[in-house]
Amino acid sequence: MTKTWFVTGTSRGMGRELVEQLLARGDRVAATLRRPAQLDDLAAQHGDRLWRRALDVTDADDVRAAMDEAFAAHDRIDVVVSNAGYGIFGAAEDLTDTQIDEVIATNLTGSIQLARAALPHLRAQGGGLLMQMSSMGGYMTFPAFSLYHATKWGIEGFYDAMAAEVEPFGIRTTLVAPGIVRTGFFDAATRVPFSAPYRGGPADGTPTTADEMAVDPVRVVAAMIRAADADVPPRRLVLGTDAYTLITDALTGRLAEVAGQRDNAATADFAAPPQAREC
C-alpha cells in the first residue's frame, strides 16, 4: 500500500535519499527545503507524486502554513519526517550567542513546531506517524559537540513526553538514532575556532574522517521506511553498530552512576511521611 510522506530538509544527505527511495517505490512525497529547485530533477521524473515547497523551519508561521498547504493538497499524509538540522562543533565557551540561538531554532525549536503543526491534522484523520531524526548524540556526548548534543537530548525528551499524549489519537512516534553516517553532514557543519585555552585539549581534533563513517545512508533510509511500514513502528530506531555500542555503553554507565546514589538519594526524603491535609 502506497503512503504519502511529508519530509523536511530534503536538499541533500539523508533527506534527499529518503525522497528518492520513496518516489522509487511509488509513494507520494511532500518535500520541503529552502530552495525547491534543488529537486527539479526528481520532479521531472516523478511528476505530481512530488509536491515541493520552500520552508524555513525556524519560522513557526511558515511551518504551520506549509503543513496546512501540504495536508490540503493531499487526501492524507501518513508519515511526517522532521529531518532538517545541522551540526556545529566547537568548545562551549567559544560559541557565540547568535550561533546558540540559530542552532537551537533549527534543530530543536523547528522540530518541535513541526510536530505541533502536524498534530491537529493527524488527529483529524485518525492517526499517523511522526518520525524525528535524532542521533546517537541524543544519548551520549563527545567534546566540542555540546550545542548539537543539547538539541538532540532536548528533542528526545520532547518526543518521549509527547508520545504518551498523542497515542490515544492513533498517532505514533519514532526517534531515529543513527551513528556516524557517511554523508556531507560534517563538511556542511559550522566549525568554531578554538580559543587558546582549548587548543590541544580534548575538544581539539577532527570530528571524524570518511573512513570512520561506518553507517550507510542508503541503508539508514531503507530502515526508516521499513519502520514506518510496521504495524507498530518502534519508539526508537537505533541504526549502526557504532550507535548501538556507544548508546549501550553510555546508558550502562549512567545507570551505574544512579545506582551509586541510592543511599544518598534517601537522605533527601522526609524523616516521616507527610501528614495528610484536612479539607
Question: Where are the model-predicted features located?
Answer:
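The beta1-alpha1 cofactor-binding region of Rossmann-like NAD(H)/NADP(H)-dependent oxidoreductases
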Residues: 55-65, 97
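SDR active-site lid
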Residues: 168-234
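Conserved glycine-rich cofactor-binding loop
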Residues: 11-13
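Substrate-binding pocket helix/loop in short-chain dehydrogenase/reductase
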Residues: 91-92, 96-101
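Active-site helix of classical SDR
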Residues: 115, 151
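Residue(s) in the substrate-gating loop at a strand-loop-helix junction
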Residues: 135
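Active-site loop immediately N-terminal to the catalytic Tyr-X3-Lys motif
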Residues: 93, 140-146
